Amino acid sequence: MTTSITTLPGILFVWTSADPEHELDFNRWYDREHVEERVRIPGFVSGTRYQSVRGPRKYLGLYRTVSLAAFQTADYFKAFGQQTPWSVANLQRMVDPMRRVCAIEAETGMGTGAWLAVLRLGAPAIGQDAAAVAGMAALGATLLQIDGVIATRLLTPDAKLSGPLPAEQKDGRVLDPIFLIDASSESAAVAAANAASAALGLDGEQEAILQLSWQLREADLHAA
């Protein structure tokens, strides 16, 4: 939608499936190395993993940052450019990965739900103006009236920062906005996704429902 502003909160959005032959090691790597490694980068606030119950890819990782500036530091460039051998191996095991670095342009409610709905808004939503962002914020406020819906976030990918992963399809990448709906139950996530899709004129194929696996916050590192 609107051009990303570096002072807005950011999210690194990584959605992928994994090679079934190496899925155990893939999850071990994510849980024991990768999430902590990313959350330790200055400016990162949390790393959260989800597993899909409905959608095109099985695993989603969300890494929240104070701002998009966190993706332009020497610490981030070092982590992204100098992957560990374990990371190199598992990045190649990703199947149909999707990496986006996004600004959070509209946010309603608060917190992290046990369930998450993900809606891709499609190419027509790219480059829309501030009024469209305000409209998404208003939609989020409406969805909060559904019992169990606790937060919504509109993510706008930054074209410069959203470089593809090694196994990601380079041709025809669409950096469309993404709408996240956090909920305390699966039924609430589904109801909100259906309501949002109806309001936005999307079809069910653009909805995904995921369950929370675990979350690591930057504050947890100091408590350990």
Each PLM stretch: what is its role?
Residues 1-224:
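Macromolecular interaction modules
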